Amino acid sequence: MIPAPLDASLLREHAFQGTNDLSTVLSPSTFTDEGGYKPVLKYGLGYFNYGLVIDDEVYDYSVCDIIRGHVYDHFWCYFCCFMILFTIWLISLNWCPSSKKSKFDWSKKKDDFKMEGGDLEYQHVKI
């Protein structure tokens, strides 16, 4: 039976995980001016530009992503709250006792028309 081929990169990575010795993974002779192919067995993982640890989580979320996901998950709750607040706002604009005229009243009231000297005046414009 033929033995499985050895993966030098994997062996060096496991050796580093076990010992935490960086010289196991990156050979000091790696940092030379020689060009060309450098085998992993001889020079280590340094020529792979290989990160030994992941700096960020694989599924790293920003605050914006978290808020958007929360709003999508609870959309109907937020929509109902918005509609209730919008309705209350419209009611307060229309029937607030402090304002004499309704802001959304489309019918003309007697207060809008004034008679001055026989001329009909509508909100300071003579007709």
Curated annotation (Swiss-Prot):
List the record's Gene Ontology CC terms alphabetically: cytosol; Golgi apparatus; mating projection tip
Q: What other facts are recorded? A: Present with 4240 molecules/cell in log phase SD medium.
Q: This chain belongs to which protein, by name?
A: Uncharacterized protein YCR043C
Organism expressing this protein natively: Saccharomyces cerevisiae (strain ATCC 204508 / S288c) (Baker's yeast)
